[in-house]
Amino acid sequence: MIHYDYLGFKEDLQVASKVYWADLRADYRENLPQKLTRLMKTAGMGQIDFEDKFAAIKLHFGEPGNLAFLRPNWAKAVADFVKERGGKPFLTDCNTLYVGGRKNALDHMDAAMLNGFSPLSTGCQIIIADGLKGNDEVEVPVRGGEYVKNAKIGRAVMDADVFISLTHFKGHEEAGFGGALKNIGMGCGSRAGKMEQHNAGKPHVAQEHCVGCGACTRICAHSGVTVTDRKASIDHSRCVGCGRCIAVCPRDAIRVNWDETVTNLNRKIAEYAQAVVDGRPCFHISLVIDVSPNCDCHAENDAAIIPNVGMFASFDPVALDMACVDAVNAQPPLPGAAAAGDCGHDHFHHLHPETDWMSCLEHAEKLGMGTREYELIKI
């Protein structure tokens, strides 16, 4: 088993990773953001040298209309922890591949502010990591990658000295569940990076939406796009699947074939996450609250499937995801929720039977990101 400490140094250790957790009980002596601060301190996040370091806090701001996303108060607790140790935190996410309220940086910032995220409420700035149109990216080699050789990661994520994931743990219709690895891997991918993970092939033009503006032809470095009779078309013999045409199309006429298998999707997520965390100080926090059946990318959220469990933290994102999914599956389904009924002790597979969430954790473990073996320590 390969173990990585928070600085990325590798040791061959047959040991379980420590995952710390706290329930959601609170009283006049300590509110929940203060309890999260105590969790971070106890779990060792203060060991990281934050002095004069840029610290990216990766979270999901929530699609407008969705109410299951993490409240800004949680982000403020993390940002304050970093600032108190001399660091320079910022909240970040990358633009979405699909049409919605977060497909470019301006809409994304509007969505974040609509959902309560601002420097006033969180104590730090918001930076959309892959820029205005989702094409400000860095190609990062994936050590040991089988599916991805160079991950396309939002530049601001890679410019940060320290990386912290703050994850709302919930279900996901393709990955099975959305945990730390999903938040890091898919979330930190640029629009082209997201396409690479979701798509086994190359994009196509929905010609009924195309107006022949030519933006796609100008951005393509491989002469793979042509416009005839004011309609663009993509020559797949020339297309390399970089996704830049998707980013620049003002009409959202260039579409992805969402045709990657769920197992390969999960393995690509693991490889993208590896590219993000490899070789720098990282820490991971997941909140198992408001566990909705689907991703916070939806413009709505269904009722929570289980009772709220608590907050979890670890240097090991693999162990963290394993601990969180075990915690969810130990809970009874809430009456009337989507997971109600016989779940066979796997709520996420019950919700999304075609998914294969374990493949992500197994592949991340194989890549050396961490271990599924964990010691759960309650504070």
Functional labels for PLM-detected ranges:
Residues 9-74, 81-93, 98-379:
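Extended, low-polarity segments enriched in aliphatic/aromatic residues
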